[in-house]
């Protein structure tokens, strides 16, 4: 693509809005047309996102513009549908929605949304006009299970996952307050997490007979960003066979990598990577996956999807390095 992609961000004051902006400021083929935030309208973007001082001279607008090629919706769950219903954005403008509003296959008005998990449907994303960006836990769990579902051998899943405080959003809550979160661990939404519907839908797209038995216990961690998931399934595969399956499935994936050594969270934080490690104990296969919830779990994957939609290098603006010390 010759000219730069003109992008807009709606909901630019929150965590995902700020993270999307940080990526786009450094993207070689992007021009930022506007950053909208009703709560911060008229203020300098760098006054709120202070790490962008010297890198971004934009101000927050209170409205969106109509001349963008693509708009990132970084709004709260339930707000994207309301925004699109009243915004009169031209259908020629592509939409990448980071909320959960359009992830499930159900009627969504004038726009049809494609589920934006590149490892699952890269070619569909390339042709899409509207993307429903996957959830952070959904991304991390799905990337550990897709290879098994692709062979129709995925059975009952028991999974636990721990997430950083940014997964709860920027609005202060009791369970994201530093004095509560630090030196503390707690479970929440046991077996009822909202991403389960999304995960089941995705797995059934590869394995229609999957019965949807996923027993998921999410945990709050005493750190700011990152997700670490361990999923346990019964499997007849030997460990070498499992590694062959996962390595083959992800051989063309730009950001998902299979590691034969144990992974940890620091390897992925501040990157768009998902790392996968496998273990076999008896007849149980254990799949460990790790991502940064704000990047591969949100803004990084959104930019990855934008790159695919506009025929750009899939890794443009996303060649990020973890700080492991």
Where are these regions (language model features)?
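N-terminal Rossmann-like NAD(P) cofactor-binding subdomain of oxidoreductases
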Residues: 2-183, 188-190, 208-209, 277-281, ...
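Short, solvent-exposed beta-strand edge segments and adjacent coil->beta transition regions
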Residues: 128, 185, 226-230, 284-286
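C-terminal substrate-binding/catalytic lobe of Rossmann-fold NAD(P)-dependent dehydrogenases
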Residues: 192-258
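C-terminal active-site/capping subdomain that shapes the small-molecule cofactor and substrate pocket
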Residues: 232-325
């Amino acid at each position: 693509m010759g000219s730069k992609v003109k992008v807009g961000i709606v909901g630019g004051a929150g965590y995902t809005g700020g993270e999307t902006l940080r990526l786009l400021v450094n993207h070689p083929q992007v021009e930022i047309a506007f950053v909208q935030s009703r709560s911060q309208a008229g203020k300098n973007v760098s006054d709120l996102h202070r790490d962008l001082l010297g890198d971004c001279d934009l101000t927050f607008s209170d409205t969106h513009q109509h001349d963008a090629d693509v708009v990132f919706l970084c709004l709260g769950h339930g707000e994207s549908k309301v925004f699109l219903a009243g915004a009169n954005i031209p259908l020629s403008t592509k939409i990448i929605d980071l909320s959960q509003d359009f992830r499930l296959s159900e009627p969504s008005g004038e726009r049809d949304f494609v589920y934006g998990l590149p490892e699952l449907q890269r070619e569909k994303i390339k042709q899409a006009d509207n993307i429903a960006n996957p959830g952070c836990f959904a991304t991390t769990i799905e990337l550990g299970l897709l290879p098994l579902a692709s062979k129709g051998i995925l059975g009952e899943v028991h999974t636990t996952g721990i997430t950083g405080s940014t997964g709860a959003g920027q609005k202060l809550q009791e369970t994201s307050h530093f004095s509560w979160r630090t030196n503390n661990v707690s479970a929440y939404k046991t077996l009822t997490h909202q991403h389960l519907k999304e995960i089941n839908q995705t797995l059934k797209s590869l394995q229609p007979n999957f019965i949807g038995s996923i027993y998921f216990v999410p945990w709050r961690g005493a750190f700011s960003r990152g997700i670490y998931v361990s999923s346990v399934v019964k499997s007849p595969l030997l460990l070498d066979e499992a590694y062959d399956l996962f390595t083959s499935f992800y051989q063309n994936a730009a950001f998902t990598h299979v590691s034969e050594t144990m992974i940890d969270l620091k390897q992925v934080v501040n990157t768009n990577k998902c790392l996968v490690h496998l273990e076999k104990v008896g007849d149980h296969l254990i799949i460990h996956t790790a991502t940064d919830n704000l990047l591969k779990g949100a803004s990084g994957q959104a930019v990855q999807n934008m790159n695919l939609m506009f025929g750009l290098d899939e890794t443009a603006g996303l060649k990020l390095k973890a700080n492991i010390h």
